[in-house]
Amino acid sequence: MTKLIFKIILIFTIFFSAEAKSKELGIGDVNSKVTIKVFSSLTCPACANFHSKIFYQIKEEFIDKGLVRFEHHPFPLDLAALNAEIIVRCHVDNSKKFELLGKIYEKQKLWAVGSDINKINNSIKKIGLESDLKNKDMDNCLKDENKQDEILNQRI
């Protein structure tokens, strides 16, 4: 009985870790001995500061040399941050996602203001358009409840 329980736990662990790996937003060598996992909200000023000042140094000195893998994990603290994460994940290409992530952090003071979520979404979508996303695709992504659940479940 103990062996059966162990096998079931092992199967679930492998399944869920494989599922989580497929959804992570990461750059760098997947075989690196070091992985930096950052949980952040796209409306967090300290997170934007980290991304604009520290992340690029880490990228240049460690990620680009294959020494470190960097993973961005969403931890949206509000609807604006959730919607920005959804827009980032509209891209298929991981490098495009990271490029857009950088732009969203860079322009955080411009889009992450106000109380009207529709205006905030339009501001985020303008940044997405600069990153080769189409309005229709972003609208579809924002309506996709599976994307919302995927992002929110990473916080747990």
What is each of the regions a protein language model found here?
Residues 1-78, 82, 125, 147-156:
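Extracytoplasmic thiol/disulfide redox context detector
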Residues 76-156:
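Cysteine-centric redox/oxidoreductase cores and disulfide-bonded domains
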